[in-house]
From Swiss-Prot:
Positions bound to GTP: 18-23, 135-138
Keyword Iron-sulfur appears in the UniProt entry: no
Pfam family, one: EFG_C
PROSITE patterns from the UniProt entry: G_TR_1, G_TR_2
A cellular component term, taken from the record's GO annotations: plasma membrane
UniProt keyword Iron-sulfur present: no
InterPro entries on file: EF-4, EFG_III/V, EFG_V-like, EFTu-like_2, G_TR_CS, LepA_C_sf, LepA_CTD, LepA_IV
SUPFAM superfamilies registered for this protein in UniProt: EF-G C-terminal domain-like, P-loop containing nucleoside triphosphate hydrolases
Provenance organism: Bartonella henselae (strain ATCC 49882 / DSM 28221 / CCUG 30454 / Houston 1) (Rochalimaea henselae)
Designated name of the protein: Elongation factor 4
Catalytic reaction annotation: GTP + H2O = GDP + phosphate + H(+)
Function as written in the Swiss-Prot or TrEMBL entry: Required for accurate and efficient protein synthesis under certain stress conditions. May act as a fidelity factor of the translation reaction, by catalyzing a one-codon backward translocation of tRNAs on improperly translocated ribosomes. Back-translocation proceeds from a post-translocation (POST) complex to a pre-translocation (PRE) complex, thus giving elongation factor G a second chance to translocate the tRNAs correctly. Binds to ribosomes in a GTP-dependent manner.
Keywords: Cell inner membrane, Cell membrane, GTP-binding, Hydrolase, Membrane, Nucleotide-binding, Protein biosynthesis
UniProt membrane topology term: Peripheral membrane protein
Length: 601
């Protein structure tokens, strides 16, 4: 039996990191009896350890709550807990498209942050109704009235009916439930008699059930035994289970229009189920797919190598397992003269890269070296073709390239105005172009266009340190722009080190080359002969440092006597060193690479 859609509310919670989104979700689950008090734990919906520890949500989770409103009716509330971080922006947009309304949660002591803005605009793009919720009003530093003004100024939505709560203590949470029922709309469309049309909101891998697919039914009915087809990939599957999360998995007979639940259908890999795809019935398909579907594209690339070469097969198996659950993570085998066998991996952004690396190290006990992150460059060749470059070491011959394009982003930075000067200086230093600057109370909101290449190194860390942690940062991908980019190679004793080559803008090549040479000079141990360390662009050396040779005192055995005897011994030593330098190999310790690559970040 399907539920009357007038009694369904599908909503998500939009907030900046740490503004209390997952804690509010916990309280809603507790107050509607989704879990017993003894079963409650912090951040119920964040199932990965790393999500709980970093206090971030990575995968979208869902829960179905039954709420008896003050008017005596029982409503079904479907909450989709979305990721808040920019790397997962596409997952956020699909989760929002599955809902009709959002709770905008803002920390009453901190106010509007950059990611709040980005996610609010996405919610508005999906024509959501918004309920403003001010969280943490019990804190001594809370200023609800100031924050309400700020929300009206920056976002332009009415805050007269804003709900003031403390998700931690439970204060005011019942008012949030009432606001969801009275202020948010029910699903706008949906016809039981039309062919099945459902949106694939998210999917994850379960060792026993295979891939679990989170769906939002638009039209028709989804039930066990149907043969379904993914319209994006054309793959067909028989539905084995249909159910909902409360947040425990509970099987139901069917899901009707407006409902959100899960299905399993012997799907082997998450890569077969693309977020945003349309699911329909094979026997009687719907006419057109839902708009807005696009496969995830990696944005940042880096090499991951095991410190111990014997771990290579374990690393491959571990990456295969992670890919089961994360279709946006891609990898291929790569060899490096300096680091041995490893993988070239593609990620959605820097947080995604950190999370994958941390999960590999933590869940699979692997010790890894990550090479400097790089972005995807486009090479326009003289013969008219366009090549994508993921690894600077693979750059084609410069003579064949007519121009190089790099990806740019539009960054929104919110900072207290006393740090504004330092923030603007940092953006200028990174080749940024200012788009706008506005003030919201004592905070400044700056919009900059920046090359992604300059952001993937250490932009975020630098921004946090110059603003004492108060600035927040969010970005959207823009498009590719032509730039004066050159490949910088590092030569040690005349041999190029592939793991350290990088594409840089010509204006900062010398500065970056010099700092890297200085670092390597301190990291590579002395040999019996002198070692030059050089940074080069093509055949031109732009920076050089020299590691001096170890000196053995060959004249120690001579006492007094003729000076020519000493000179002869010194000349002989000089000849030997010359020969050694010609044939000797420089041993670069692994630790030097790790340190040098850290410096690169």
């Amino acid at each position: 039996m399907t539920v009357d859609r007038n009694y369904i509310r599908n909503f998500s919670i939009v907030a900046h990191i740490d503004h209390g989104k997952s804690t509010l979700a916990d309280r809603l689950i507790q107050m509607t009896g989704g879990l017993e008090t003894r079963e409650m734990k912090e951040q119920v919906l964040d199932s990965m350890d790393i999500e709980r520890e970093r206090g971030i949500t990575i995968k979208a989770q869902t829960v179905r709550l039954h709420y008896k409103a003050k008017n005596g009716e029982t409503y079904i509330l479907n909450l989709i807990d979305t990721p808040g971080h920019v790397d997962f922006a596409y997952e956020v947009s699909r989760s929002l498209a599955a809902c009709e309304g959002s709770l905008l949660v803002v920390d009453a002591s901190q106010g509007v942050e950059a990611q709040t803005l980005a996610n609010v605009y996405q919610a508005i793009d999906n024509s959501h109704e918004l309920v403003v919720v001010l969280n943490k009003v019990d804190l001594p530093a809370a200023e609800p009235e100031r924050v309400k003004e700020q929300i009206e100024d920056v976002i332009g939505i009415d805050t007269s009916e804003a709900v003031e709560i403390s998700a931690k203590t439970g204060l005011g949470v019942s008012d949030v439930l009432e606001a969801i029922v009275t202020q948010l709309p029910s699903p706008r469309t949906g016809d039981v008699n039309k062919p099945l049309k459902a949106m694939l909101v998210d999917s994850w891998y379960d060792a026993y059930l295979g891939v679990i697919v989170l769906v939002r039914v638009i039209d028709g009915i989804l039930k066990k035994g149907q043969i379904i087809r993914m319209m994006g990939t054309g793959a067909k599957y028989p539905v084995e289970r249909v159910g909902v999360f409360t947040p425990k998995m509970i099987q139901v007979d069917e899901l009707g229009p407006g409902e959100i639940g899960f299905i399993t259908a012997s799907i082997k890999e998450v890569a077969d189920t693309r977020v945003g795809d349309t699911i329909t019935e094979e026997r009687c398909p719907c006419e057109e797919a839902l708009p807005g579907f696009k496969p995830a594209q990696p944005v940042v690339f880096c090499g991951l190598f095991p410190i111990d070469a014997a771990d290579f097969d374990d690393l491959r198996a571990a990456m295969g397992k992670l890919r089961l659950n994360d279709a946006s993570f891609s990898f291929e085998v790569e060899t490096s003269a300096a680091l041995g066998f490893g993988f070239r991996c593609g990620f959605l952004g820097l947080l995604h890269l950190e999370i994958i690396q941390e999960r590999l190290e933590r869940e699979f006990n692997l010790d890894l070296i990550a090479t400097a992150p790089s972005v995807v460059y486009r090479m326009n060749m003289h013969d008219g073709s366009v090549k994508e470059l993921h690894n600077p070491a693979d750059m084609p011959d410069i003579v064949k390239i007519s121009s190089i394009e790099e990806p740019w982003i539009r960054a929104t930075i919110m900072t207290p105005d006393n740090y504004l000067g330092s923030v603007l200086e940092l953006c200028q230093e990174r080749r940024g172009i200012q788009v706008s600057l506005s003030y919201v109370g004592t905070r400044a909101m700056v919009t900059y266009d920046l090359p992604l290449n300059e952001v993937v190194f250490d932009f975020y860390d630098r921004l946090k340190s110059i603003s004492k942690g108060y600035a927040s940062f969010d970005y959207q991908m823009r498009d590719y722009t032509e730039g004066d980019l050159v490949k910088m190679s590092i030569l040690v004793n005349g041999e190029s080190i592939d793991a350290l080559s990088m594409l840089v803008h010509r204006t900062i090549a010398e500065k970056r080359g010099r700092s890297l040479c200085e670092k390597l000079k301190d990291l590579i141990p002395q040999h019996m002969f002198q070692i030059p360390i050089q940074a080069a662009i093509g055949g031109k050396i732009i920076a050089r440092e020299t590691i001096r040779a170890l000196r053995k005192d060959v004249t120690a055995k001579c006492y007094g006597g003729d000076v020519t005897r000493k000179r002869k011994l010194l000349e002989k030593q000089k000849e030997g060193k010359k020969r050694m330098r010609q044939f000797g190999k420089v041993e670069i310790p692994q630790s030097a690479f790790i340190q040098a690559l850290k410096m690169n970040k």
